[in-house]
């Protein structure tokens, strides 16, 4: 068939196999009229366009079949076709939905200008274009992409050079298909021209390419938010949702949570105050079951505490992160097997008040007391309710002479950074407790900087890696609920980092280097975690499904757990600066 392009001032020619042009009269009445049968059904289709409509129907059928085979079948349910009676354009828009782009509306004032395409010289092999990525295989490992790469030219005058392409087109997959009606015409699918010869290429969704555009749009939206360009940010956050649906696995989930955080910040629909602590504890339990991060945190902290308690007859653990008490059965069993018999074990569990008037901390202590009786460990427990760790004072904890004290905190101290002077008060109270060991586990990330865009970029990389590790855990269908609830657990953190400010932003994670500086200035010295902890942590990961992707790393006496090359959590141990050094095993080495 032939496709005619009509210009109001110049005669138009249609591309033909012989390359000859055909002159057309400017009078539209001389063109073929509307097809009467389709007109009765409400569709305005010229008889001369029937072949083109048939071709688009064939293309749409082939794209749907191929997309279903790839597991990528989708249509944007929110798309509005303003004139569905225009059957040709309607089919074209449906085809474009299978390959969504941020610039789907070419006249969108919020997006950068698109370089004009040369349809006269186009070929099935698009020319190579520069990419800001340093590797063609992304594996969804996000790179630092400045938001300016997308819309830095939006405010520029029209005479400025067009913005560079947002993604490489050389990765687009083409599947040749034959058709009896496929003549030598130019088909425009997915926004760029492809000449059809005897075989007509059909553009399929390229998840990697769309993923690149998705990252660009996320970064651009975050920069628009920082610049308080809310009109642009609103347009971009809608595009994020449109692009995310074409992604599979971790990328789609991460983008969805970040889009929610951005939307809440744009529309000022801030998340409700932190959920009931018991529900948050349940989410963390699912996270504990799904992946090894909390297991690693508990194991490495327990190992440091066990070594500090060596030879002590009366020991006292003060736990800033009691939750469900999952950390302590393993330590109690290790103490029960200690040569010479177990010590007298006292545990003070600190937690927030419950909103349902239940004594949650008492229930946890009762279960631990039952275990202690079973393994013949003398056990004493006290649950201590506190609205904030910053409200603690050493005198409240009934410290006793002759006790060896250990203070433990897992994912708790970073929230104190939202309260001015909070972390300083807690560290001062810890010093007054005169502990033999302080164990701290925190996220290895910097989500507490003053610049929103920097926090957004860092958190996007961090949580993308975390979600990738969840996908790589090899979770069985039986544990699907654990995985889903773990994603909710991480999604709440994302929303807090992105949407909230001031005291409501409590997910203020900092790096190990930052914690080292803070604890050093507060009067604490680091205690090396020995090679025994390193080896046993590595063995723990070897037993965990999907453990091939996890890596234990020693960092100046501290232990880190990460996914592939990215550290995600860090365990460190500390003692008072004026205390003699604790005996330690050989420093870890990997």
UniProtKB/Swiss-Prot annotation:
Placement of sequence motif DELLA motif: 35-39
Region (SAW): 499-575
Localization per Swiss-Prot or TrEMBL: Nucleus
Any GO BP: gibberellic acid mediated signaling pathway
Region of interest called Leucine repeat II (LRII), as start-end residue ranges on this chain: 363-395
InterPro entries in UniProt: DELLA_N_sf, TF_DELLA_N, TF_GRAS
VHIID, short sequence motif: residues: 315-319
Motif (LXXLL motif): 413-417
Keyword Nucleus: yes
Listed Basic residues bias regions: 1-10
Start and end residues of each stretch annotated as VHIID: 284-349
Region (Leucine repeat I (LRI)): 212-266
Keywords: Gibberellin signaling pathway, Nucleus, Phosphoprotein, Repressor, Transcription, Transcription regulation, Ubl conjugation
Domain notes: The DELLA motif is required for its GA-induced degradation.
PANTHER family: OSJNBA0084A10.13 PROTEIN-RELATED
Protein name: DELLA protein GAI1
Species this protein is from: Vitis vinifera
């Amino acid at each position: 068939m032939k496709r005619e392009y009509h210009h109001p001032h110049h005669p138009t020619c249609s591309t033909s196999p012989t390359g000859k042009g055909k002159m057309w009269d400017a009078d539209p009445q001389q063109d073929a009229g509307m097809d009467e049968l389709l007109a009765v059904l409400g569709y305005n289709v010229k008889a001369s366009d029937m072949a083109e409509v048939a071709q688009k129907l064939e293309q749409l059928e082939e794209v749907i079949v191929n997309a279903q085979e790839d597991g990528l079948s989708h249509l944007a349910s929110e798309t509005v076709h303003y004139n569905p009676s225009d059957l040709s354009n309607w089919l074209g828009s449906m085809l474009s939905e299978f390959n969504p782009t941020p610039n789907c509306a070419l006249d969108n004032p919020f997006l950068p200008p698109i370089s004009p395409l040369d349809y006269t010289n186009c070929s099935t092999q698009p020319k190579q274009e520069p990419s800001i990525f340093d590797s063609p295989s992304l594996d969804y490992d996000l790179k630092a992409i400045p938001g300016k790469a997308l819309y830095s030219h939006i405010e520029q005058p029209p005479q400025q050079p067009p913005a560079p392409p947002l993604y490489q087109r050389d990765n687009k997959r083409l599947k040749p298909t034959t058709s009896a009606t496929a003549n030598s015409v130019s088909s425009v699918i997915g926004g760029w021209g492809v000449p059809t010869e005897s075989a007509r290429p059909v553009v399929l969704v390229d998840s990697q390419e769309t993923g690149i555009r998705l990252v660009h749009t996320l970064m651009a939206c975050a920069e628009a938010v920082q610049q308080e360009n809310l009109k642009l940010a609103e347009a971009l956050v809608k595009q994020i949702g449109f692009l995310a649906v074409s992604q599979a696995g971790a990328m789609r989930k991460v983008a969805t949570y970040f889009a929610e955080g951005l939307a809440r910040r744009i529309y000022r629909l801030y998340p409700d105050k932190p959920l009931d602590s018991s529900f948050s504890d349940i989410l963390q339990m699912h996270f504990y079951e799904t992946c090894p991060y909390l297991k690693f945190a508990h194991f490495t902290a327990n190992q440091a505490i066990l070594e500090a308690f060596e030879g002590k007859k009366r020991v006292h653990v003060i736990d800033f992160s009691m939750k469900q008490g999952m950390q302590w059965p393993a330590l109690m069993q290790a103490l029960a097997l200690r040569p010479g018999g177990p010590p007298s074990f006292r545990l003070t569990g600190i937690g927030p008040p419950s909103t349902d008037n239940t004594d949650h901390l008492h229930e946890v202590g009762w279960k631990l007391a039952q275990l202690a009786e079973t393994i013949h460990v003398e056990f004493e427990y006290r649950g201590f309710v506190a609205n904030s760790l910053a409200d603690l004072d050493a005198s409240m904890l009934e410290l006793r002479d002759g006790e060896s004290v250990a203070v433990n905190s897992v994912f708790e101290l970073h929230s104190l950074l939202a309260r001015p002077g909070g972390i300083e008060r807690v560290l001062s109270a810890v010093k007054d407790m005169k502990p033999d060991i302080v164990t701290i586990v925190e996220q290895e990330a910097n989500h507490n900087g003053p610049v929103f865009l920097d926090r957004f970029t860092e958190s996007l990389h961090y949580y993308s890696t975390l979600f990738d590790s969840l996908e790589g855990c090899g979770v069985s269908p039986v544990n699907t609920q654990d995985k889903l609830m773990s994603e909710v657990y991480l999604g709440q953190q994302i929303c807090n980092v992105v949407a909230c400010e001031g005291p409501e932003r409590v997910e203020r994670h900092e790096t190990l280097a930052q914690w080292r500086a803070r604890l050093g200035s507060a009067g604490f010295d680091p205690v090396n975690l020995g090679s025994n902890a390193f080896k046993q942590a590595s063995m723990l990961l070897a037993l965990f499904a999907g453990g091939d992707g996890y890596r234990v790393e020693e960092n100046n006496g501290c232990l880190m757990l990460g996914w592939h090359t990215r550290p995600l959590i860090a365990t460190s141990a500390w003692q008072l600066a004026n205390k003699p050094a604790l005996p330690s095993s050989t420093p870890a080495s990997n």
